[in-house]
Swiss-Prot record:
Top-level taxon in the UniProt lineage: Bacteria
Ranges annotated as spanning the membrane: 5-27, 32-49, 53-71, 84-106, 116-134, 155-177, 182-200, 207-229, 234-256, 265-284
InterPro entries according to UniProt: Sugar_transport
GO cellular component, one term: plasma membrane
Protein name per UniProt: Putative sugar uptake protein EF_0928
Protein topology in the membrane: Multi-pass membrane protein
UniProt record similarity statement: Belongs to the GRP transporter (TC 2.A.7.5) family.
Organism whose genome encodes this protein: Enterococcus faecalis (strain ATCC 700802 / V583)
Keyword Membrane on entry: yes
Keywords: Cell membrane, Membrane, Sugar transport, Transmembrane, Transmembrane helix, Transport
Amino acid sequence: MSLLIALVPMIAWGSIGLVSGKIGGSANQQTLGMTIGALLFSIVVFFVIQPTLTTATLIVGFISGLFWSLGQNQQFHSMKYMGVSVGLPISTGMQLVVNTVAGAVFFHEWTKTKDFVVGFIALAFLVFGVYLTARQDDDSQPKTSNSMLDFNKGIRALIFSTVGYGVYTIIINATGLDPWGIILPQSIGMLVGASFFAFKKVKVDRFVWMNMTTGLLWGLGNICMLLTMREIGLAISFSLSQMGIIISTLGGIFLLGERKSKKEMFYVIFGCIFVILGGILLGYMKA
């Protein structure tokens, strides 16, 4: 059951880039709208579950939310600079490395030699798959490039994004606090952080309100990942959640109209296959 719940973030989070890309708006508008939606989701969950809130839960949740807002804001910027089908796969690969190493090494989630062998093979498959989905055909760049894309700015944004996302998950796993109690203060921290990035920079209009939909998707994926993180560990739960890259990459091409050459489509297909193989290996570890 834990493995099935761990796959919910894959679908929910894998759809966020597509939904926000379809809705439109600036990176700041997308982040602000998303955090408002996540706050509404957490308020409903709080009144339904009625978890106990401690001082530690409030502080850790709030800090986690602040760092998440940094990660998400910079990821939206990277997608503006690099496109969804390129920016999101690279972001996923960077997060996979950080969270897997943290879970396996620092939190001692992998204790046997087999765990490390199978785990790092799975990670290699995932990262290689992510690399293939983001790989570009140099010969076709004049045809497929967009004048608004900037790879260097995108990479800088992704570095900040990875730091933010890394702290968001690692701090919660390190403290072992109740996930149901975490999400409300976490969503408040998210909104505060998003408001900071959007201060005097964002026009609150229909793009903000429509992007609340992505917040509901994020909230669903978030609580499922936090719950499974305690059962199967950070390394595996986070890695499985990032398999949504298949949805975001193919959706970016077929739904958002991001153009790919024949060679790039070849890379994407084989990249998705490697991501799936990596996910199967991770599932085997906890079977």
